[in-house]
Regions:
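Low-complexity, Gly/Ser/Thr/Pro-rich intrinsically disordered linker/tail segments
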Residues: 199-223
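Export/targeting segments at the very N-terminus of extracytoplasmic proteins
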Residues: 32-99, 129-131, 137, 194
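Surface-exposed patches in mature extracellular/periplasmic domains of secreted proteins
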Residues: 87-91, 103, 146-157, 194-197
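N-terminal Sec-pathway targeting helices
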Residues: 1-24
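Hydrophobic alpha-helical membrane-insertion segments, chiefly the h-region
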Residues: 22-33
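A cross-kingdom feature marking charged/low-complexity
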Residues: 183-201
Length: 223
């Protein structure tokens, strides 16, 4: 029996050796060539289809103003980087700056997400879009933790600070109550994938248009 098994093993050995050589030397080369071809095809997709990368990956609602949609690709990247819903980031940017990365408030809030100076580390460029987004997103995540994941309450926290989470809305500052109203309704429309937002239109009519006009000038989008 042992001799029979030995003969079978010796008969199959060359085939096993050939298979191992194929796996070690041939398969990696073939796989690399296949992946390289696939990569080249993917690289050519924008030219073949006329669709740019940013258009393919756009995930924010289409009703946000042109000034906010100008930052679409960055919003998507920041959302992934800081584990946030891109529509939530877009809603905060819409209300805070309408996409004007140079704007500052009388209270000292800076940039796209109107981040207060005490959130920044010494020496940081407070209006740099990536730095501003990092600090704004970090604080928004803090607010989501305080609000136990409630995005509307997190936006109120973003405006009024963490202490408002434990207070009834009747004790909030009027600015925070307005922020909560605008933010929650605009974000709700975005979550429903609407093409238009009555809430955003109301915000624009209540004074948001002026902010967006300034943003358009800053971004070179005004006619």
């Amino acid at each position: 029996m042992k001799k029979q098994l030995k003969r079978i093993f010796l008969r199959l050995l060359p085939g096993w050796i050939a298979l191992m050589l194929l796996i070690v030397f041939v398969l990696p080369t073939a796989l690399a060539a296949t992946l390289g071809t696939t990569g080249r095809i993917l690289d050519q997709l924008p030219y073949l289809t006329g669709v740019t990368v940013s258009e393919r990956i756009s995930v924010i609602a289409p009703f946000f103003t042109e000034e906010v949609r100008h930052w679409d690709e960055e919003i998507n990247r920041w959302a992934q980087q800081y584990d946030l819903d891109p529509n939530l980031l877009a809603t905060v940017m819409q209300i805070e700056s309408c996409g004007d990365w140079t704007v500052s408030s009388p209270a000292g809030a800076q940039g796209l997400f109107q981040v207060m100076p005490f959130h920044f580390a010494a020496g940081e460029n407070q209006i740099d879009p990536d730095t501003n987004a990092m600090r704004g997103a970090n604080f928004l995540n803090v607010c989501l933790d305080y609000s136990e994941g409630d995005p509307a309450l997190a936006m109120a926290c973003y405006n009024g600070g963490q202490t408002i989470v434990s207070k009834p809305s009747s004790e909030w500052a009027s600015e925070t109550r307005r922020y909560y109203q605008w933010g929650s309704t605009i974000y709700a429309d975005a979550g429903l994938s609407k093409d238009t937002s009555p809430a955003l239109q109301s915000w624009l009519e209540a004074g948001g248009t002026y902010l967006c006009d300034l943003a358009a000038q800053s971004l070179g989008l005004s006619g």
